[in-house]
Amino acid sequence: MYNCAIILAAGKGKRMKSSMPKVVHKVCGKEMVNHVIDNVRKANIKDVNLVIGKGSKTVKEHTKDRNLTYSMQEEQLGTGHAVICAEEFLKDKKGTVAIFTGDAPLITNETIQQLFEFHNSGKYAATLISSTVQDPTGYGRIIREASGEVKKIVEHKDCNEEELKVNEINSGMYCFDIEVLLNSLKNLNNDNSQGEYYLTDVIEITKKSGDKVGAIVVPYEEIMGVNSRVQLSEAEIVMRKRINHKHMVNGVTFIDCESTYIDVDVEIGNDTIIYPGCVIQGNTTIKEECTLYSNSRICNSVIGSGVIVENSVILESHVGEGTTVGPFAYIRPETKIGKSARIGDFVEIKKSTIGDNTKVSHLTYIGDAEVGSKCNFGCGTVVVNYDGQKKQKTIIGNNAFIGCNTNLISPVKVNNNTYIAAGSTITKEVPEGSLAIARSKQINKEGWLDKKGLLKK
């Protein structure tokens, strides 16, 4: 059986009060529309068409790696009109098409699979996703036959007294036999107060043709649409609970899961402990037995097993197993830190490689450098990598000891097994096995304060 999907993503999203199209706003680190696309893919649906309109260039940019086809809805004339705009995608296809909305990011791949299975096994012409709620005010009601089939969808304003008591509501997500859908679209009109073409009318047209219409009921959170910043926040809360629950089931400890913020594509190994206030973003991988103390942020990075991170920021970097980072360290993009290293408080590292067992304990800046293994950086070391025009490189070999308050003026090389005296400014290569001293000779002027009249009696 051939299955495909259409995702409606052309809405203006006026209530978002944003210059960006609504569907590219993110929930737990991923654009809403990409949540829907990815879950459709996980349900083994290969052919996906995205109906775009306002901000189409931006939507395409955010979905360019999803292997989609696109249909353009130049004017927003309703959900039915959006599907009409995708008729070319359905041309000459036979099978089943599901229709989803790009602003409902909480739909799961399990529900999508269930929708197709229910629709195809029951040989329905159309199937919709519904939900039951305590207060259905404002929603279209699903009215069923005695057999359980869907009889009709009645908008709230059109409900009679009995229909108002129904708490099963329409989600705006459907499955259709492609041939039935295309035939029904031919009879769709905009004879309503808004002058728009509604997809709900296709259900009525299908039913009047004598075809079977079914519905599956799912939890309300799966059909939640996002039309405002408030609803975006509500969707974020639901998604975050799902993400954190998944990691806890897989063996991750959360000291307070309600104040821990993890993006949807993050991977975390078992026996890792995460303290409150941590933010883990993007395509980050954290391996087993790590400890992330409060208020740490990690983005698009790989953290090896047994790493401890305390009150620190790690961006687009790799940290080797057994390393400790922080408190208050800043690891900037393109940094690779080896195994069992120590990156201490108020250390900033940018675009550098740090070898195994190297210690950078405090108050140090390292930029555009290659640092070997078993090195020690004294407090206040600065790699001076910018010459006013471009960044220069520093190379430090294995077993180098860098004394406190040392400036390494790039480009410069410090070879293996070297010592640099505290307070030095190094501008030339330091040979292997040597001690480098580059500071002014101390001069003591006896009686100077007395001569200047500054000596306190």
From Swiss-Prot:
Keyword set for this entry?
Acyltransferase, Cell shape, Cell wall biogenesis/degradation, Cytoplasm, Magnesium, Metal-binding, Multifunctional enzyme, Nucleotidyltransferase, Peptidoglycan synthesis, Repeat, Transferase
Q: Does the keyword Transmembrane apply?
A: no
Q: Which reaction does it catalyse?
A: alpha-D-glucosamine 1-phosphate + acetyl-CoA = N-acetyl-alpha-D-glucosamine 1-phosphate + CoA + H(+); N-acetyl-alpha-D-glucosamine 1-phosphate + UTP + H(+) = UDP-N-acetyl-alpha-D-glucosamine + diphosphate
Query: In the record's cofactor note, how is the cofactor described as bound?
Result: Binds 1 Mg(2+) ion per subunit.
Give the record's pathway. Answer: Nucleotide-sugar biosynthesis; UDP-N-acetyl-alpha-D-glucosamine biosynthesis; N-acetyl-alpha-D-glucosamine 1-phosphate from alpha-D-glucosamine 6-phosphate (route II): step 2/2; Nucleotide-sugar biosynthesis; UDP-N-acetyl-alpha-D-glucosamine biosynthesis; UDP-N-acetyl-alpha-D-glucosamine from N-acetyl-alpha-D-glucosamine 1-phosphate: step 1/1; Bacterial outer membrane biogenesis; LPS lipid A biosynthesis
Active site annotated at which positions?
362
- Give me the Gene Ontology terms describing cellular component: cytoplasm; membrane
Q: Which locations, inside or outside the cell, does it occupy?
A: Cytoplasm
The molecular function GO annotations come to: glucosamine-1-phosphate N-acetyltransferase activity; magnesium ion binding; UDP-N-acetylglucosamine diphosphorylase activity
Region of interest (Linker), ranges: 230-250
Q: Which residues form a coiled coil?
A: none
Instruction: Give residues annotated as binding Mg(2+).
Output: 103, 227
Subunit info? Homotrimer.
- Family in the record: In the N-terminal section; belongs to the N-acetylglucosamine-1-phosphate uridyltransferase family. In the C-terminal section; belongs to the transferase hexapeptide repeat family.
Q: What does this protein do?
A: Catalyzes the last two sequential reactions in the de novo biosynthetic pathway for UDP-N-acetylglucosamine (UDP-GlcNAc). The C-terminal domain catalyzes the transfer of acetyl group from acetyl coenzyme A to glucosamine-1-phosphate (GlcN-1-P) to produce N-acetylglucosamine-1-phosphate (GlcNAc-1-P), which is converted into UDP-GlcNAc by the transfer of uridine 5-monophosphate (from uridine 5-triphosphate), a reaction catalyzed by the N-terminal domain.
Tell me what this protein is called: Bifunctional protein GlmU
- What organism is the protein native to? Clostridium botulinum (strain Kyoto / Type A2)
